[in-house]
């Protein structure tokens, strides 16, 4: 009679707890011997077992026990100590692996981008060095040409100065010669012309 009474009470408790919607998700702990019971107490029979780390929906709580519904749509009672509000490593590992893969992919992309930028920077640096070397060579060439032009200008100025001096000397000699010849004619003409006059008079 007591067994029937307990069974009726358990059925009523179950039907009452089913109507309560907690809408709460918890996770079975890593305990390997996690058993489900038909009621909220050790006196109730074991209704089965549940895998560690499985997510379950909380329907009701009574004392040390919690009524849950698993992914197989089974409803049973489990010790509060066998539940956790944080996902187990079984649930977290795939997420962590996915995050690690995502981060690895991002790092790989960043590394690829960095390598491309490094190669581009090295190429530009090398190109700039080559252009700088060309400009330096052109600058040196222009300096050499400028020095050669200055030397030629100095030579031309020296030649021009020498030519000017030579022309001046030639003009000086020519002018002196003309002056000398004129002076000579000026001295000789007075002596030549009177003699002619005398000869004309005698005739």
Swiss-Prot record:
- What membrane topology term does the record carry? Single-pass membrane protein
**Superkingdom of the organism of origin:** Bacteria
What keyword terms does UniProt attach to this protein? Membrane, Signal, Transmembrane, Transmembrane helix
Signal peptide positions (record): 1-23
Q: Where in the cell is it found?
A: Membrane
Q: State the InterPro entries in the record.
A: SH3-like_bac-type (IPR003646), SH3_dom_pro (IPR016476)
The record's listing under Pfam families reads: SH3_3 (PF08239)
SH3b domain boundaries: 24-87
Q: Which Gene3D superfamilies match?
A: SH3 Domains (2.30.30.40)
Where is it chiefly localized?
A: membrane
Annotated membrane-spanning segments are: 167-189
Does Transmembrane count among this protein's keywords? yes
**Cellular component GO terms, alphabetically?**
membrane
For this chain, the family text in UniProt reads: To E.coli YgiM.
Q: What is this protein called?
A: Uncharacterized protein HI_1605
Recorded source organism is Haemophilus influenzae (strain ATCC 51907 / DSM 11121 / KW20 / Rd)
């Amino acid at each position: 009679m007591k067994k029937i009474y307990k069974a009726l009470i358990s059925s009523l408790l179950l039907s009452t707890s089913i109507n309560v919607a907690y809408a709460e998700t918890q996770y079975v702990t890593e305990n390997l011997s996690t058993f489900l019971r038909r009621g909220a107490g050790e006196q109730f029979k074991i209704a089965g077992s549940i895998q560690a780390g499985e997510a379950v929906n909380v329907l009701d709580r009574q004392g040390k026990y919690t009524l849950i519904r698993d992914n197989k749509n089974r409803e049973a009672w489990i010790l509060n100590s066998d539940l956790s509000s944080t996902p187990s490593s079984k649930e977290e590992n795939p997420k962590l692996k996915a995050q690690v893969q995502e981060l690895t992919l991002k790092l790989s992309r960043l590394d690829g981008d960095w390598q491309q930028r490094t190669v581009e920077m090295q190429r530009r640096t090398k190109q700039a060095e080559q252009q700088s070397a060309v400009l330096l060579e052109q600058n040196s060439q222009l300096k050499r040409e400028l020095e050669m032009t200055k030397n030629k200008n100095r030579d031309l100025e020296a030649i021009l100065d020498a030519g000017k001096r030579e022309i001046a000397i030639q003009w000086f000699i020519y002018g002196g010669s003309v002056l000398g010849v004129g002076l000579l004619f000026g001295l000789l003409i007075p002596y030549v012309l009177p003699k002619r006059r005398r000869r004309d008079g005698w005739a």
